[in-house]
A protein has these predicted regions:
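Terminal leader/tail segments of proteins
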Residues: 1-91
Length: 91
């Protein structure tokens, strides 16, 4: 597992299996997962700042060509489930 902080309030967590979880502030909002069929972003809207964070992650870091066509929009619950799968709670 690797933690990469891009800037204040933008963090990427990468796992050994290739899964990526991108956080804006403390919320996982985008990433990459084979189980979610590639790159994904939340369908939920949080703020214009979070939207900019997601777009920068997909366009600059992940370098996804044509993100509008190549990124799946998923329910926030799917991202939350992915987090709990990758980081099981001990409680």
């Amino acid at each position: 597992m690797k933690l990469h902080s891009f800037a204040t309030n933008r963090t990427l967590l990468t796992f050994d299996d290739g899964t990526e979880l991108f956080f804006s502030y403390a919320t996982p909002v985008a990433g990459y997962s084979r189980s979610l069929h590639g790159y994904f972003r939340t369908k939920s809207w949080y703020s214009s700042t979070t939207t900019r964070h997601i777009n920068r992650y997909l366009n600059e870091y992940a370098d996804v060509p044509n993100p509008e066509q190549n990124v799946h929009h998923v329910d926030q619950s799917a991202i939350t489930k992915l987090v709990s799968t990758q980081i099981p709670s001990r409680y």
